[in-house]
Amino acid sequence: TKQIEEITNYKIRKQNLEDEIKRIKNSNDPNKEKKIKRLEKRYTLGGLNFDAVVIADFDESLKSVSTSLLYTDVLPKNKYFITLNQWFDESLLNETDIQPLYYPSINKENFDSYKIKYFNAFNEDPNHLSLLSYDLVGLVYYLSLNSNVENLNKIFKRKNSFKGKIGIFDIKNNKINHRLNFYKIKEKELIKIF
């Protein structure tokens, strides 16, 4: 909470609100009661010097940080709330106060298909490591069919792409990057952006 207060200039913005309420109370404004009631519903007053907040958290911690932001008048309707891959945590669909919420992730349809296959094979839900290893095994198989062992080093040095079951992987300079989709949760719905 202390970090959130610092990045949102909470104390200054809280003081701005108190000063504005006091100014209106002492004014001759005919609508001052209405204005004061509206201001009293807020926690702070004043602008913020950022457009988005990246929340590097999951589960209840994500919800806690997001709620703390709400109490400093950082609202997802005015600022982008972006987080890490939430693995399609369905509980976030019901957290309408922190929506819209944006995050990168693997393709949802491919993920759902994989979960069904995994459950049918092992009678339990897959963990995240099994998901990534699923395509890694596919990559190794693909490479073994299309290359001899001596050329593997060359394959990882030049630019290549591999389409796995759960996504597309780019290979370049001995690094593998997984192309992710970007999703938004808004009004209790999961929306694929790209």
What are these regions (language model features)?
Residues 1-33, 48-52, 60-134:
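Extracellular/periplasmic periplasmic-binding protein-like sensory domains
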Residues 35-38:
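A small/polar active-site loop signature that marks catalytic segments
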Residues 57:
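Metal-dependent nuclease catalytic core centered on acidic motifs
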Residues 123-134, 141-190:
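Segments of small-molecule ligand-sensing domains
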